Amino acid sequence: MRLATVIVLCSLFLGVSGDGWYSFFREAVQGTWDLWRAYRDNLEANYQNADQYFYARGNYEAQQRGSGGIWAAKIISTSRKYFQGLLNRYYFGIRNHGLETLQATQKAEEWGRSGKNPNHFRPEGLPEKF
């Protein structure tokens, strides 16, 4: 637990730009909201093979916020990856379940965080609302 706290605090310290703590945390909160909105849209769309698009879109929108948004997107994406791995391994008893999907999701998240257009992952026929 101490190690996790130290890692989070160090990443916070290194992630803060010259703009100050307030803008960094504001960007982080807004980036978290962007990821949440993309997740909610993914659930609402309920469209097959659209997960990568929504992951890329959420990370792209968080990246547009600034360094705080990028930091929040990395923390949330990494936490989701590890939590999903723990669930698969210890709760479901499956070690490599969804490994290809997880790697494709990571690629989409990195694509969005790098500032590239998330529509690269947009599936055909997804309603324009999303």
Curated annotation (Swiss-Prot):
Residues 1-18 form the signal peptide. Residues 121-130 have a biased composition (Basic and acidic residues). Expressed by the liver; secreted in plasma. One of its GO terms (cellular component) is high-density lipoprotein particle. Keywords: Acute phase, Amyloid, HDL, Secreted, Signal. Induction: Upon cytokine stimulation. Gene3D superfamilies: Serum amyloid A protein. It is found in: Secreted. Pfam families: SAA (PF00277). Residues 109-130 are annotated as: Disordered. One of its GO terms (biological process) is acute-phase response. It comes from the Eukaryota. Apolipoprotein of the HDL complex. It is linked to Reactive, secondary amyloidosis is characterized by the extracellular accumulation in various tissues of the SAA protein. These deposits are highly insoluble and resistant to proteolysis; they disrupt tissue structure and compromise function. Belongs to the SAA family. Major acute phase reactant. This is Serum amyloid A-4 protein. It comes from Mus musculus (Mouse).
